[in-house]
Structures are given as C-alpha cells and as structure tokens.
Amino acid sequence: IIKSVAKICVYGNGKSYFLWNNALAYYKKLNHLFEDIKSDTPKDYLYPCFITLCSATLEYSLNLIYVLYCFRHFEYEDYKSYLETYRNMCFKNKLFMFPYIISEGKLIINEDSQEIKSLYELITKRNGLLHNSEKLRTFDVPDINASIINDKLVIPSENSQIHILLSAEDNIIDSITKDDCIRIGNVIFSFYKQILHPYVNDDELNICDFIKSKN
C-alpha cells in the first residue's frame, strides 16, 4: 500500500516540512467505480464519469511524482520554482516528460506501448468531455429555381418542398464504451503498481510497460 505521508524533512532552522499523499483516496474511489462498470448491468451513464475520474487520478499521480522529485532534490526555495514549471505543463507533456526528468535523462516514455497509447487516448477523451462545444456546420441547399418578381421570392410549385439531410457527428459523451473503460482502467491501475507505488515508497523508477531506456 502506498504511504500516506510521502516525505518529512526536519531542519534545525525552526522550519520543518512534510508532504501528504492522497493518491490512495483517488485509486480507492476509482476502483469502486471500476467494479460497478465491470458488472453485468449496463451503466453507460457511468462511462464518462469513469474517464473523468481516471484522468483526475492520473494527473494527481503525475503531479505527486513531480512534487516528490522536487522535494527530494532541491532546497525549499528552489523546490517551489522547479515545481511551478513542471505543474504548468499541459497534461500530455506531464506524462511525456516525467521519466526523462525523474531519471535525469536515462529513461523516456515508451510511446510504442499499448499502455502509453491508452493513456494518450484517455487524455484525448478527457479533453473532449471537459472542453467540448458545438460549432457551425455547413450543408448544401439544392437549386430550387427561385426568382425575384416584384420584390417577392417566387418558387416553382414543384419545388415548394425540399428535403435536406443533415448528418450529425458522434458526440464524445456517447462514444465511450464499456470496453474503453475496462481497458483504460486496467492501464491506470498498472501505472499505480509499476510507477507510482515504487517511486513514492522507494524512490525507484524502472523500465516497465510504460517506460524504456533512452538508448
């Protein structure tokens, strides 16, 4: 089990610091939702909720990794400056850069792995859910041989009715499936076991399904 208190530093200057770790709270709630989704009863309304919680859990995990890295390697004054830089990266870049930063250039993300591809897909779905909006779309109007006579629009009787077919695009909230959730959920829990748990508890980051050697 991952430690709740990730780091404590005691200094003789009257100031001491500790770093609290709430990752387990995220993963516990995610696991409860995961079990509901895997059940036989269809619950498609939970799918977008699951994707949102998965992305929140992943980003919290990445932020915790960066916080721990800065806490372990920099004095408090420098820690804040470095951490601000890392936390201001976009979500995908946080994922892409963390093994290179943590390992000081020895490890990189394995973009060929299905695990990383699933995490990239998760981020894309999350962005689609949380930042979705509608846009104007074009359609073709058939020629109805209309004319202007005495400042009035005149349409031939045979064209008084026209049929226009409007095609709708798939909405992200309806496109998420149970299989998507199960696949992405399994990857998130693998991230916990292979990366977050060993790094938080033992300060270790190793080659795994998500990470490969730079060379």
Regions found by a protein language model. Name each.
Residues 1-48:
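Charged alpha-helical initiation segments
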Residues 42-50, 86, 116, 149-157:
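Glycine-rich, flexible loop segments associated with nucleotide phosphate handling
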Residues 44-69:
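Short, hydrophobic, well-ordered secondary-structure elements
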Residues 123-128, 141-215:
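Amphipathic, Lys/Arg-enriched alpha-helical patches that create a basic surface
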Residues 63, 67-151, 164:
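Flexible secondary-structure boundary motifs
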Residues 8-11, 33-40, 68-71, 89, ...:
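Surface-exposed polar/charged interaction patches
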Residues 23-26, 30, 58-64, 122-129, ...:
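Amphipathic alpha-helices that form helix-helix packing interfaces
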